[in-house]
Structures are given as structure tokens and as C-alpha cells.
């Protein structure tokens, strides 16, 4: 079974009737072999299914319509084995509402120089057939991924898998529902946004619920369910002995187990893949969920604090895109700085950082929480894994959306942080904190982000391209001057692109 189960990508091969039944039979056989090779590859995380070779405008339109209506098809790989006149593709490409990747490949890797003849030349025409197809895609102003190289090589298969993961992210975006418990943190700007515009742009729905709706489900959780959940905690984490020695702390842990099980039922029953809450809206709940939120993220749900539904969506989408990979994804906040020989950012939040990014087995402890509400709250404490990561922020610009991506390198803290009982990660932004923070602020990036070690910069940008939004990258080569120029150019482009 592939990572993404019954989801699939269709390989659609273009040709034309001109070549006759013999060539078309060989084209079909080769397409089946390529699809089978990709499906069997350990580098490709999704099933690739070859469709019948399309040879006319009607056949192209039919396969586009079939893809649109098939719930398991998340995207198409298009390839011209022979020459396929591109005017035939206009109707189908305009009708297609799922993403496609243009695979510029050839069935054979090498030319049989001593034996090559015109039959071989007629059969293997992707070198110019794909150029014809590329022309009409550009003429139609369709954004798409182009992957070039022999289909059987590891490099090409990795690129194909990367795109397939983005297609899965886009599929999730189209079907995602986000539950908002309460509202945004009062007077905060960046967590606001136009939810109707977001649904039009990204596909996901945002639904608001009063705390009473959640409270009913939480209160219905039984003591037996809570006891069983605490046994799970004992297996998964290093639980502080003080919790079981202190009746008050043990009650705080039981509160958290009840919150987790109640929220899980609410989200599962409602078909939600992400959620938000706010420490200013807790009426009816025992406390701001800490451990509960962390565990729900670990189970795959997206989360955004203080009502930040855009970040909640991005965390969920990053988790879907990175399924089966080593790196985790979490809600995160740029909390405080270390100005030293190398400037660093300490990322954390009040409680809600996902243990999928933990470097070691998390500790489960109860500590006093003093922001917004004053409660002892159970939470997981850990430090993030070292290595490359991304901080991704999606913001509402008023008339459009922008994605800001900062490449960072997560490092080990130089000392222990015994007085900081929260999950955290310490990172060094690329190219450095001075430039990265300046660029981020110029771009209007949020103080929250989707922090991920599971997807690449190219995958984040490809997702933004599928969504039709601006993406700007702050990385090793960024300068503030060039970045500001890019923002100005992008402002003009995105203002004009749909009308010129």
C-alpha cells in the first residue's frame, strides 16, 4: 500500500491518429510500463495509473472530465510520447480543474545510434511533442510543474513524488474544514482575514463554534475513557512522577485527557482537519488545552492559536504533504531572540507546539500557566530536532493572499532551559536574523507560522502556485534591497494578472 492509500495520479499520454495502430499500441504499452515503474518505486508515495492514450480533442476532454469527477484522482501527469498537436488540448486543459504536471521524458534513456531509423524517430517524439504541448499551456496561462529527465532515474522520481505530495496538499486544501472555538485574540490584526476569499482561493471552509458546543462533548467523556487515555500517556511520554503523587496535578492531567478526547470526537464527527482556539475564549472549559492540543497536532490535525485559521490550515496541509517522511510540522511563534556570535530565534508558544518535531521523547509535566488564564496545565516539554526547517506564513493582503517562507536551521540550545516549561525550538534564520527578520517584516509575515521539517521550499512554492497566490522566499541569497524590489514587482503582477 502506498503512503496515500487509494489516492492516485493519472498518467495521460498524448499522441494522434496519424501514426497508425502499430505505433499507438507501442505508445500505450510504454505508458503502462512507466506508470507501473513509478507505482512500484519506493521513491513515489502515490499510485500512478496510466489512462488510455489520448489522440483527439474529444478524448482529451473526456479524460479531463473523468479526472474532475473522480474523487481518488488528485492530479494528472501529462506526457507527449509522440507529437500531439496542441490545439487538440485546448478544450481539455480549460475544462480540467485538477493540477497537472508536465513530464518531459522519453521511454528509452539512450539512443540506439547504430540501429536508429525513422520508425524509432516517429515513435519517440517527446523532444518536440512536449514543446508543442508546453506552448499551449503557456498560451493558456496555466501554472504547472515541468519535470525533465528520464522517468526511471531517482532524481526524476523524487521530483515526481514531490509534485504528487503537493497535489495531495492541494486535494486536502480543497476538502479541509477548520473549526474555530471562540474568536481571534482581541485587537490582533494578522490572525484576521476574509474567510470567504480564502474558501474561493484555497477551497477550505472555516466554521465558528461557541465554547458551549465543545463543552457538551467534553463533558460527555467518561471517567473510564479518561483513565484509559492516561495509560496511553504513560506509554508515549516521560511522565513526571509528581503528577501521580499530587492529587491536584493528577486532576490537571485528567482535565487534559478529557479535553483531548472531547475535542477529538468533536473534530472527527464534524469532519474537521484543523482547529483554532483562543485563551480569551474559554468559558465552560477547565483551562486552555495544552497537552490536548499538542496530541491532536501529533495525530495530524492542524492548529492555530488565538483564532489563527490560516496557520491552522497551513499546518494541516504541511502534515498531509509530508506524510511518511521523517520531519514533523507544528504551529509555531517567533517568541524571543538571542543576539550573539550568531543571532538566533527561540520559537515556542504558550503551550501548543507539536511533538512531531521533538528531538527526544517528550516529558509530560504540570506547570502554572499565567497568560490569559491562570491555571496549572499539563503539557509536553521538549526541544525541536536539529536540521533544516521552514517557517511558513500565509497572510491576507486585503485583495489577495501572500505566502512568506523563511529557510532556517534548527540547532541545539547552548545550555539547558530548566525554567522554561514549554516545548521550543532554537533556529538560525537564513541568511541571518538581521536580513531574514527585516524581509519578513517588509512582507507583512505573521508572528505565527507553520514550522515544518517535512516539506521543501519548492513544495511550499508549488502549493502556492496551485493556489494562485504569491510566494516569497527568504533564504541564503536574500538581500533586503532585492526582496523589497520583488515585493513591488509582485504587487504589480498580482494586481494585473487576471485582467491583462
UniProtKB/Swiss-Prot annotation:
Cofactor: Mn(2+)
Chain sites annotated for binding Mn(2+): 306, 333, 349, 448
Record-linked InterPro entries: Ara_Isoase_C, AraA_central, AraA_N, AraA_N_sf, Fuc/Ara_isomerase_C, Fucose_isomerase_N/cen_sf, Lara_isomerase
Cofactor, how bound (note): Binds 1 Mn(2+) ion per subunit.
Segments crossing the lipid bilayer: none
Keywords from the named record: Arabinose catabolism, Carbohydrate metabolism, Isomerase, Manganese, Metal-binding
Pathway in which this enzyme or protein is active: Carbohydrate degradation; L-arabinose degradation via L-ribulose; D-xylulose 5-phosphate from L-arabinose (bacterial route): step 1/3
Molecular function as annotated in GO: L-arabinose isomerase activity; manganese ion binding
EC number: 5.3.1.4
UniProt cross-references to SUPFAM superfamilies, sorted A to Z: FucI/AraA C-terminal domain-like, FucI/AraA N-terminal and middle domains
A GO cellular component entry from the record: cytosol
GO biological process terms on file: L-arabinose catabolic process to xylulose 5-phosphate
Family classification: Belongs to the arabinose isomerase family.
Biological role: Catalyzes the conversion of L-arabinose to L-ribulose.
Designated name of the protein: L-arabinose isomerase
UniProt source species: Cellvibrio japonicus (strain Ueda107)
Gene: araA
Amino acid at each position: 500500500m502506498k503512503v496515500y492509500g487509494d489516492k492516485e495520479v493519472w498518467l495521460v499520454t498524448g499522441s494522434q491518429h496519424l501514426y497508425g495502430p502499430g505505433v499507438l499500441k507501442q505508445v500505450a504499452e510504454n505508458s503502462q510500463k512507466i506508470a507501473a515503474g513509478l507505482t512500484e518505486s519506493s521513491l513515489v508515495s502515490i499510485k500512478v495509473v496510466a489512462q488510455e492514450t489520448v489522440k483527439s480533442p474529444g478524448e482529451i476532454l473526456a479524460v479531463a472530465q473523468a479526472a474532475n469527477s473522480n474523487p481518488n484522482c488528485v492530479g494528472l501527469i501529462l506526457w507527449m510520447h509522440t507529437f500531439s498537436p496542441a490545439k487538440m488540448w485546448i478544450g481539455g486543459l480549460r475544462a480540467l480543474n485538477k493540477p497537472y504536471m508536465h513530464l518531459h521524458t522519453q521511454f528509452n534513456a539512450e539512443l540506439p545510434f547504430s540501429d536508429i531509423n525513422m520508425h524509432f524517430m516517429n515513435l519517440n517524439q517527446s523532444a518536440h511533442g512536449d514543446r508543442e504541448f508546453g506552448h499551449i499551456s503557456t498560451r493558456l496561462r496555466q501554472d504547472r510543474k515541468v519535470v525533465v529527465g528520464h522517468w526511471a532515474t531517482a532524481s526524476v522520481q523524487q521530483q515526481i513524488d514531490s509534485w504528487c505530495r503537493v497535489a495531495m496538499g492541494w486535494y486536502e486544501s480543497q476538502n479541509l474544514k477548520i473549526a474555530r472555538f471562540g474568536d481571534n485574540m482581541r485587537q490582533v490584526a494578522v490572525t484576521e482575514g476574509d474567510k470567504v476569499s480564502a474558501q474561493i482561493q484555497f477551497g477550505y471552509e472555516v466554521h465558528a463554534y461557541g465554547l458551549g458546543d465543545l463543552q457538551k462533548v467534553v463533558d460527555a467523556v467518561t471517567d473510564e475513557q479518561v483513565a484509559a487515555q492516561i495509560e496511553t500517556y504513560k506509554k508515549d511520554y516521560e511522565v513526571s512522577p509528581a503528577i501521580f503523587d499530587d492529587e491536584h496535578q493528577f486532576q490537571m492531567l485528567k482535565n487534559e485527557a478529557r479535553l483531548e478526547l472531547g475535542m477529538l470526537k468533536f473534530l472527527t464527527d464534524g469532519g474537521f482537519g484543523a482547529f483554532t482556539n483562543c485563551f480569551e475564549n474559554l468559558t465552560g472549559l477547565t483551562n486552555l488545552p495544552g497537552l490536548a492540543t499538542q496530541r491532536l497536532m501529533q495525530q495530524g490535525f492542524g492548529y492555530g492559536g488565538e483564532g489563527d485559521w490560516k496557520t491552522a490550515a497551513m499546518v494541516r496541509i504541511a502534515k498531509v504533504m509530508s506524510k511518511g517522511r521523517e520531519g514533523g510540522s507544528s504551529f509555531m511563534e517567533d517568541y524571543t531572540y538571542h543576539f550573539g556570535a550568531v543571532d538566533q530565534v527561540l520559537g515556542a508558544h504558550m503551550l501548543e507546539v507539536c511533538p512531531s518535531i521533538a528531538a527526544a521523547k517528550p516529558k509530560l509535566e504540570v506547570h502554572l500557566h499565567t497568560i490569559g488564564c491562570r491555571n496549572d496545565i499539563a503539557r509536553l516539554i521538549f526541544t525541536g530536532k536539529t536540521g533544516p526547517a521552514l517557517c511558513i506564513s500565509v497572510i491576507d493582503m486585503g485583495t489577495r493572499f501572500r505566502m512568506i517562507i523563511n529557510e532556517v536551521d534548527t540547532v541545539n540550545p547552548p545550555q539547558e532551559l530548566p525554567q522554561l516549561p514549554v516545548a521550543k525550538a532554537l533556529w538560525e534564520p537564513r541568511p541571518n536574523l538581521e536580513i531574514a527578520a527585516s524581509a519578513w517584516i517588509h512582507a507583512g509575515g505573521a508572528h505565527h507560522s507553520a514550522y515544518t521539517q517535512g516539506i521543501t521550499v519548492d513544495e511550499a512554492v508549488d502549493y502556492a502556485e496551485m493556489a494562485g497566490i504569491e510566494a516569497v522566499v527568504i533564504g541564503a541569497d536574500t538581500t533586503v534591497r532585492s526582496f523589497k524590489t520583488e515585493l513591488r514587482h509582485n504587487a504589480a503582477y498580482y494586481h494585473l494578472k487576471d485582467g491583462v
